[in-house]
């Protein structure tokens, strides 16, 4: 099958077929990636918020959202509209510039990271050759926005929440990057498309989760910590810090923090799907499937079926992980700040280093299995 392609090429060729010049086609493409990212991210957040509220209600033997649309499906949209029209209050002693820039600096890197996520065989907004490196670089910007928001609020609870968020993010960013580096080493590429293609040779047996089980666990723990999900929600612990760095925020600025958090959760689940669970790949080989139905793999019908099911597989794997994250929220207690830092620096960091060294050794010893 064809490898994942850049949507820009398909769009440009389609516009040129209508008689427009290449320069005009490229100019028309410029705003589309961000539009696609915003639409997919917002839809992902709306679904995730609804799922979380319904699952949380089930865990507490409640009904949950019910009146806004069928089964309360429109409740997240109603909440967003409510926050949109609420008054935007800036504390009198706050730094108004940093207070405003902080939430934006938290949200923008998370949205930009969606550019590298391949949703299907031929559904990729930007096939960046260094996609993984770009994602790690963008994710390192978010703690600056959190610290800026906490500091600029001129509130002791906000400042403590911002400091906790920065410490937590730095502590878990390193083992997260080392876990991803082991995948990059096996795939010989920083491209998310190449990583998925490398996993789709023998069905689910070729998924990276079997060759990197330790890396998978490290990545998932670090991803939950980066998203500040329970049991790692220390920066906004209600019993200790009111709402952490969000304490003085209201209206749409307050909503931006939650929007960034849920977008980051869905993004992390998608990246786990791409890096460890074969992305758009099926549990069975597509070659075996095409031979089973008696059609060539190059048959247009097989290509359409594979592309459509590939998108479904990517989203299904991601939302299974989102479901797991929501369950963890209601089944695990919050850790203390010293336990959180000890887990990152004394446990996950050494294990991720050992995992990287073992992966390098196995790559040399078994190049066919570990991508030599």
From Swiss-Prot:
Primary place of residence? Answer: membrane
Which compartments is it annotated to reside in? Answer: Cellular thylakoid membrane
Q: Which InterPro entries match?
A: NADH_UbQ_OxRdtase_su1/FPO, NADH_UbQ_OxRdtase_su1_CS
Q: Quote one Gene Ontology molecular function term.
A: quinone binding
Name the cystine pairs: none
Q: What top-tier enzyme class does this entry carry?
A: translocase
Q: Could you tell me the Gene Ontology terms of the biological process aspect for this record?
A: aerobic respiration; photosynthesis, light reaction
UniProt keyword NAD present: yes
Keywords assigned by UniProt, alphabetized: Membrane, NAD, NADP, Plastoquinone, Quinone, Thylakoid, Translocase, Transmembrane, Transmembrane helix
Q: Which Enzyme Commission numbers does its entry carry?
A: 7.1.1.-
Stated membrane topology is: Multi-pass membrane protein
**Catalytic reaction annotation:** a plastoquinone + NADH + (n+1) H(+)(in) = a plastoquinol + NAD(+) + n H(+)(out); a plastoquinone + NADPH + (n+1) H(+)(in) = a plastoquinol + NADP(+) + n H(+)(out)
One GO cellular component, as annotated: plasma membrane-derived thylakoid membrane
Q: Does the UniProt entry include the keyword DNA-binding?
A: no
Q: Write out the transmembrane intervals.
A: 27-47, 97-117, 128-148, 166-186, 204-224, 266-286, 308-328, 347-367
Instruction: State the function annotated in the UniProt record.
Output: NDH-1 shuttles electrons from an unknown electron donor, via FMN and iron-sulfur (Fe-S) centers, to quinones in the respiratory and/or the photosynthetic chain. The immediate electron acceptor for the enzyme in this species is believed to be plastoquinone. Couples the redox reaction to proton translocation, and thus conserves the redox energy in a proton gradient.
HAMAP family assigned to the protein according to its UniProt record, in alphabetical order: NDH1_NuoH
On subunit structure and binding partners, the annotation says: NDH-1 is composed of at least 11 different subunits.
What family classification does the UniProt entry report for this protein?
Answer: Belongs to the complex I subunit 1 family.
Any idea what this protein is called? Answer: NAD(P)H-quinone oxidoreductase subunit 1
Please name the source species: Prochlorococcus marinus (strain NATL2A)
